[in-house]
Amino acid sequence: LWLGPRGGYTAATPRFAKKIEKGGNGYLNSDSMDICVGSEKYLQNLEKFLTDTCTEFDIQYLKLDGFCLKPCTNPKHDHITGGENDMYFVTEMWQRWIDLFTRLRESRAKDNKPLWINMTCYVNPSPWWLQYVNSVWLQNSMDIGFAKNLEQQAQVDAEITYRDSMYYDFMCTRALQFPAKNIYNHEPIYGNTAKVEYTDEEFEKFLFWNACRGQAFNELYLSYNKMNSAKWRILARMLRWQKANHHILKNAMLLGGDPAENNIYAYAAWTKAGEGIIALRNPTDEKTDLTLTLNKLMGCPENLRAVKCYNVYNTTGADSLDLFSYGDKMQITLAPFEMKIFQFGDRDNRCLAPENTNDFTLSFT
């Protein structure tokens, strides 16, 4: 269920908020011209709606999209106001939301049902929230964007660079201590309104790179008319690999420089048992030679001994027959805009063999 607590992001938002108030179900926040998301009666009504709806339709995912744009300062509403930076309102508002989340989870738990809660806009991306929700939006990026670091680059490379530059801002510049697995990043987007066109090869590159960022779930913003048989199979293969290796990918960390400043960078993820995934990318139009050292700077455990290296995505190289241990070095060349994804371990977990699948067509008349 995708629901906007503040009433959406359109010109209709103020009108919707006024209808909520007129119906006695909450209030208009005149400071931001949307629904007052700190109102006690609004949250009571919303909690009942969410609880009943999740139960009736067995909903296991809630995307709560848009919270408090501006604190409400109306003293006639059923919430407190005042304090430095309106913190009286903010504190009470979030406490009410915490109570809502808690009771909602308790309701689902009684039926032995899971519930994934995703908080999007106007939320501080603090790991503190992970006591109550499963994921939080990055907050610092557009739904989709394209980097301007180079004029002559494919659309897919500009999009990848843009999103990773926002990750760099989030993880490195702002140094927000937030686990990658709980980030909501809007990917993958391959829809009509996004105005993107990717070949099958570019689609594969886009999907597998996004998986290496480590997020635990994907919202598939895909327009069916833009998909073909090859793209559906690429998507299925990526999702199988991502799911099978989430125990590794969830530990992803961003290494290197800001890709929007034409820096080579990587995502590296390891387990204590020595399973690892390293994704390297060159966001520039120049060939780059580099030495990859398997040490603690790359997140490698010091007990790494004699593991194999498998190509998850590598269009210019064959699988290596060498065994790698802690401290070993790999000499790598990255062509312009090239990316490589290596998986380390005792066995091949790339999920290359397809599961039992059949081609089929759904027709609607």
Feature map (PLM): residue ranges:
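Active-site-proximal substrate-binding groove within the catalytic cores of carbohydrate-active enzymes
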Residues: Q95-T316, K329-Q331, P336-F344
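Active-site groove signature of glycoside hydrolases
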Residues: E47-H79
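Active-site beta-loop-alpha junctions enriched in small/polar residues
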Residues: W2-G8, F67-L69, T120-N124
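C-terminal beta-strand-rich structural cap/linker in extracellular carbohydrate-active enzymes
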Residues: L321-L362
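The substrate-binding groove and active-site-proximal loops of carbohydrate-active enzymes
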Residues: L28-E47, T81-R96, A194
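Active-site-adjacent "subsite" loops/lids of carbohydrate-active enzymes
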Residues: L1-F57
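Hydrophobic faces of well-ordered beta-strands that scaffold small-molecule active sites
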Residues: L1-L3, L62-L64, I117-M119, F217-N218
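Short secondary-structure boundary/capping segments
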Residues: F16-K18, H77-T81, Y132-N140
